């Protein structure tokens, strides 16, 4: 047990401090913005301090553990802890949420509620990544859905209510399977119902039962990741949501699905995972090709970026299915890498929309001349998205490739076939990325003539873009920033598998 409750403070602070926003004066937008940003900064500094001074990198076990009795009736505990798998997503959450609150500066309608919902979402996400009790994980998973639904339905495009309803139907449907899986695992292990992660990891289940649990958890995480064919909420949601909400969705929300797959499906249910992993591999390769070939057909800029997210999630799925140290490390690196790149692309798409008020790519063109800074940043992040060497996306995809090639589970021919199909997907990625840049920034359209209302990015937007760009370059140059966090934990997870 940790003496000082670092994690409880980190989880509770945003929603607790955020509740005071509702008492701030109604007209004081500036006060509300600064208050929210200060809370996010304080939270990020607290998290960084706790991890720098109280987290040992070479220890693969759970650290900063807090374990309090909550409900005696069925041994439900408030149990939090951090290990090498969850430290990356927690820091990513803090970083992206702080920048998303800065990106939400222009929001003036109901800004008190908007900023409170962002902070409530922050608490739910950090709680999901750090909970060590299955029911607590489920509660945090659900807590984070309510703010997202309200953010989607109240701020965004004309069809925002439709996309918010679609989002909540998909995710609530997935959550039913998650709850069934959590209760099944908790009740079937022994005479005493136990929802503790540590005891569940050491349980052995009959194979048929483990497969049923695996499918239940998989459906819940497949909606969130998203995995084909449960991905259709994503383009609609991203197409309509406000861009600061999009940053949180692309940067953190999707990563919760990948985190759940590794944390529960791989760690708790290793036998079922080794049975299903070839199918995951096939679905992952289909997803890369499908999304990369669907993306060029999208007229809406944000929908095109959303399909690129679906394509990148295929790499995470393949890394998880490879059951190798290298592949799983590559998947974790891709989780962090895409968190930065996806958030930045949606932010830049949103700031461009604020200026030119156009959504469809075929109506744009020639925007590079009046907005050179936005053009430069957009081009840079598009290159990062198509895995240009020297950027984080390239390292992550190469490590996933190596993970498949070195996997002991698959025969040579299937490995060659999967690698070949993935390579085709990597060729399709530049096609939609570069055509998006060409349609938006080049050519001759209305924006070649000087306009009073089309102006370049200001210091706030430039600060957000550069803040995200630095870690993308940093991880691309020196991936051990992220890999050193997870490498021991990955070895621990894979020690449960037979062939190594």
Curated annotation (Swiss-Prot):
TM stretches of this protein: 4-24, 37-57, 87-107, 113-130, 134-154, 167-187, 207-227, 242-262, 272-292, 305-325, 330-350, 386-406, 416-436, 462-482
GO molecular function: NADH dehydrogenase (ubiquinone) activity; quinone binding
GO cellular component, one term: chloroplast thylakoid membrane
Top EC class for this record: translocase
Keywords assigned by UniProt, alphabetized: Chloroplast, Membrane, NAD, NADP, Plastid, Plastoquinone, Quinone, Thylakoid, Translocase, Transmembrane, Transmembrane helix
GO biological process entries: ATP synthesis coupled electron transport
Pfam families associated with the record: Proton_antipo_M
Localization in the cell: Plastid, Chloroplast thylakoid membrane
Record keyword Nucleus present: no
Domain of life of the native organism: Eukaryota
Membrane topology: Multi-pass membrane protein
Main location per the UniProt record: plastid
EC nos: 7.1.1.-
Disulfide bonds: none
Homology family: Belongs to the complex I subunit 4 family.
HAMAP family: NDH1_NuoM
Descriptive protein name: NAD(P)H-quinone oxidoreductase chain 4, chloroplastic
Organism listed in the record: Lactuca sativa (Garden lettuce)
Lineage of origin: Eukaryota, Viridiplantae, Streptophyta, Embryophyta, Tracheophyta
């Amino acid at each position: 047990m940790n003496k000082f409750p670092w994690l409880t403070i980190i989880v509770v602070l945003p929603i607790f401090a955020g509740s005071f926003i509702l008492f701030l004066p109604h007209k004081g937008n500036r006060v509300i913005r600064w208050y929210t940003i200060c809370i996010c900064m304080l939270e990020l500094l607290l998290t960084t301090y706790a991890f720098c001074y109280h987290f040992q990198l070479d220890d693969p076990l759970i650290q900063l553990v807090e374990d309090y009795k909550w409900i005696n009736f069925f041994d439900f505990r408030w149990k939090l802890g951090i290990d090498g798998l969850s430290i990356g997503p927690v820091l990513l959450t803090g970083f992206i949420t702080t920048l998303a609150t800065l990106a939400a500066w222009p929001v003036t309608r109901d800004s008190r509620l908007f900023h409170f919902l962002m902070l409530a979402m922050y608490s739910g996400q950090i709680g999901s990544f750090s909970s060590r009790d299955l029911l607590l994980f489920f509660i945090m998973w659900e807590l984070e859905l309510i703010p997202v639904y309200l953010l989607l339905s109240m701020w965004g495009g004309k069809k925002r209510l439709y996309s918010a309803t679609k989002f909540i139907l998909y995710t609530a449907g997935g959550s039913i399977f998650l709850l069934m899986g959590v209760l099944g695992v908790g009740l079937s292990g022994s005479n005493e119902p136990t929802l503790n992660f540590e005891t569940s990891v050491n349980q052995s289940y009959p194979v048929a039962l483990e497969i049923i649990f695996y499918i239940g958890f998989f459906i819940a995480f497949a909606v969130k990741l998203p995995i084909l064919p449960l991905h259709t909420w994503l383009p609609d949601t991203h197409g309509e949501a406000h861009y600061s909400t999009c940053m949180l969705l692309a940067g953190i929300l999707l990563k919760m699905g990948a985190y759940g797959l590794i944390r529960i499906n791989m760690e708790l249910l290793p036998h079922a995972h080794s049975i299903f992993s070839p199918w995951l591999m096939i679905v992952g390769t289909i997803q890369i090709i499908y999304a990369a070939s669907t993306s060029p057909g999208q007229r809406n800029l944000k929908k095109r970026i959303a399909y690129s997210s679906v394509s990148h999630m295929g790499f995470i799925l393949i890394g998880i299915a490879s059951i190798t140290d290298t592949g799983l490390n590559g998947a974790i690196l891709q989780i962090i890498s895409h968190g930065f790149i996806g958030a930045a692309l949606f932010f830049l798409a949103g700031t461009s929309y604020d200026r030119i008020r156009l959504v469809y790519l075929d109506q744009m063109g020639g925007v590079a001349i009046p907005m050179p800074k936005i053009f430069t940043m957009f081009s840079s992040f598009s290159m990062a998205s198509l895995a240009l060497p020297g950027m984080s996306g390239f390292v992550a995809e190469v490590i996933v490739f190596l993970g498949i090639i070195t996997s002991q589970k698959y025969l040579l021919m299937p490995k060659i076939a999967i690698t070949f199909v993935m390579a085709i997907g990597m060729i399709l990625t530049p096609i939609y990325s570069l055509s998006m840049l060409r349609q938006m920034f080049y050519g001759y359209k209305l924006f070649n003539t000087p306009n009073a209302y089309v102006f370049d990015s200001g210091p706030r937007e430039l600060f957000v873009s550069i803040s995200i760009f630095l870690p993308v370059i940093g991880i691309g140059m020196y991936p051990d920033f992220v890999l050193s966090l997870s490498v021991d934990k990955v070895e621990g997870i894979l020690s449960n598998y037979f062939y190594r």
